[in-house]
Amino acid sequence: MEKSTPYKIDQNLSYFYTLDEKNIFALELKHLLQDEDPFYVALLENDPTNNNTPEADGFYSTANVLGLDTGLDVYELNQNRRVKSNQLDAKLDYYYILNEKSNLNFVGGTILSKQNFDSRFFQVLDSQGTTLDPTPIFGADPLTSNDIEYKFTDLYLGLRYRVKSGIFTFSPGFTAHAFNTNNSQYGTDFFKDTFQKILPEFKMIMQFKRSESLTLDYRQQVNFTDVNQLAKGLVANGYNAFFAGNSDIMNASIHNVSLFYRSYNLYNASNVFARVAYTKTIDQISTDFNFVPGSVVSFRTNLNSPFDNETLTAFGRIGKTFKKIRTSIGGNFTYSKSFQFLQGNVNENLLYNHSYNTSVGTNFTKAPNVRLRYRVSFTDQISGNRDDFNTVTHVPSLNFDAYIWDSLTFKSDFSFNEVKQDGNVTNSFKIWDMTLAYRKNKDAKWEYELIGSNLLGTDSRTTVNAGNISRSINETFILPRFVSLRLRYQL
């Protein structure tokens, strides 16, 4: 019997000190100590008498690809894995107040991280514990064990200036980083990268009123990976799915810009929210998928994409109340461009998604309330080497709740879902839940509640998903019609 004894110790310290009205200090310390030791065991039946014949077991070709001993009645596959992490984050902010409308923020800090990753994939040959370290026939360097130490250091200093002029508040700034990463594998393979980078940032707020503003935000970021993506030896995610890291992986650079508008108006009971954001990722850490011919084995590794990934998102919502009637209308839009690496080939994937929703409902204090909602969503996925994938989803719903005779509460929730893929209905289902609760008065100790779930007896719901390398239809089974009585006593 394998035992797993992981632990995680996360400590945080925050300290604020005001020296005087012009000098303020803020200290933040975080420390993470973590030990993970997941294990993997798979038992697969085998008939060694029909090897190399048309009647061979389905796993036989896969066993050959993995380099296993095929002469046993059972394939017993094991993987031991251990990841130790030790990370310290420390940051000191110093604020110098210039005047009522401007201040300076000096920041300095460090991130010190160390990770150790050890793993071994092997086959158990007999009850005495004899093991075999297989030699797979796929991958550039098919090692079945890992022994890696990864260290990451980030030393940084930054300056931000904040000034207010009229309705504008400007906050330009930058942070200068000195990065150092190095990893050693098997005690012989060393990789080190040291570089410096200045990351600018800018924020502008237009405060039209106390309840209305427009915010523009831009910043650059650097994204690093962790030890799991660097370990070169094979790691089993399943008996036929393996991953090997890349010790030469570099960091990714990210540009983010966003524009956000908000408005509250208490006089005409309305609110407006809108946001547009754009993200561009350079040297994205991507996955290269490979399938071993003649088997069901998939093999993944990673690389820095030579192409830039882009994402554009936008959403908006308007809500207004007319006396006791609440209304809202909104929409979302997403565009993304990514690149898929499969069997050494590159394919561009484009995703367009836009959805719209509206609702109208009542807001009575004593009378029953009803709310009607409707949402429609359109998704288009365009892939260079596959047919386009188009999905339309319609979701109307009706909610009702009433508080009757100061003792009885009635709630009803109904929704209908219809999914169309390439113009054809792939799934439609209805869900209706209801609750009836009785409490004699607000001081009563007893409450009786009758709950009905899935009253229409819907069996399942189906979703159609389009991934980077495959398309899938997933069926989720729903609990059958269920009615229960709940008694609650308040002490």
Regions found by a protein language model. Give the residues of each.
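Primarily recognizes Gram-negative and organellar outer-membrane beta-barrels
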Residues: 1-490
